[in-house]
């Protein structure tokens, strides 16, 4: 599975002002194989199916 990691509000995990390697570490924490900053958000590869990733159809970012 691949996709954009989400923060606690359902938004894409920002990497806009993060140090180099931030997204790779965040993806590894979620058991992903790799990841990078697809400016301005973290994109991961090889994620297990239990990890929730951002999807346009189910986007809840900024909504209450």
UniProtKB/Swiss-Prot annotation:
Q: What SMART domains does the record tag this protein with?
A: Knot1
Q: Which GO terms describe its cellular component?
A: extracellular region
* Domain of life, source organism: Eukaryota
Q: What biological-process terms (Gene Ontology) are attached?
A: defense response
Specify where it is mainly localized.
secreted
- What tissue specificity is annotated for this entry? Expressed by the venom gland.
- GO MF entries: sodium channel inhibitor activity; toxin activity
Residue positions where Cysteine amide is found in the record: 61
Domain observations: Has the structural arrangement of an alpha-helix connected to antiparallel beta-sheets by disulfide bonds (CS-alpha/beta).
Q: Please describe what this protein does.
A: Beta toxins bind voltage-independently at site-4 of sodium channels (Nav) and shift the voltage of activation toward more negative potentials thereby affecting sodium channel activation and promoting spontaneous and repetitive firing.
Name of this protein: Beta-toxin Tf1
Q: Which organism is it from?
A: Tityus fasciolatus (Central Brazilian scorpion)
């Amino acid at each position: 599975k691949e996709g954009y990691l989400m923060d606690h509000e359902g938004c894409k995990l920002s990497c806009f002002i993060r140090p180099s390697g931030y997204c790779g570490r965040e993806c590894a924490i979620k058991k992903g194989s790799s990841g990078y900053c697809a400016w301005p958000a973290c994109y991961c590869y090889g994620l297990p199916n239990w990890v929730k990733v951002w999807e346009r159809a189910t986007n809840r970012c900024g909504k209450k």
